[in-house]
Design a protein with these regions (language model features):
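C-terminal catalytic/substrate-binding lobe primarily of soluble NAD(P)-dependent oxidoreductases
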Residues: 1-160
Length: 160
């Protein structure tokens, strides 16, 4: 989903004569501390696919958390998320940026981002109107400011 949203944002900015650049490319990768953890994550993705799209879903769902079951309060509070972005400019300069925040990314952090998006939509007078928009294009800097003020960090990092 992230790739599609980023590409949609790029297309909207292109149409608005405010392009990401003609050579814009977005790739999404996962990083794991070991081969074992990468295999476990891959197994999780395979199981998720089976749950969603095969006749086995009825069998597999009996062993998964039920709707409304989620992590306990301690897990929600002690979780965190981090994303690392490699950006290469047209002149070849490479920089790295990261986003990170506290709270379980599947529950607390997502709820925080959704609430900040809703508040931005309700109170900002700087928003673009019309059509099917992405949060980057439709909510833009007002949302970014709210996310930063709510504790989510966006920063340039040194990465080798």
């Amino acid at each position: 989903a992230n790739t599609r949203v980023v590409r949609r944002s790029s297309a909207l900015y292109d149409a608005d004569q405010n392009s990401y650049g003609s050579d814009f490319i977005f790739k999404e990768l996962g990083s794991y501390p070991s081969k074992k953890s990468a295999r476990i994550a891959s197994l999780g993705l395979i199981l998720a696919f089976l749950v969603i799209s095969t006749p086995l879903r009825h069998l597999i769902r009996r062993f998964l958390p039920k709707p409304g079951d989620g992590p306990d309060k301690e897990t929600r509070e002690n979780g965190w998320f981090k994303g690392l972005f490699k950006v290469e400019a047209e002149d070849g300069e490479i920089k790295y940026f990261q986003i990170y925040g506290d709270g379980d990314p599947g529950y607390k952090a997502t709820a925080q981002m959704v609430c900040e998006s809703a508040i931005t939509l309700a109170i900002s007078d700087e928003l673009v109107v019309g059509g099917v928009l992405t949060s980057a294009y439709g909510l833009g800097n007002p949302l970014l400011d709210r996310l930063i003020n709510s504790g989510i960090k966006f920063e340039e990092v040194i990465y080798n």
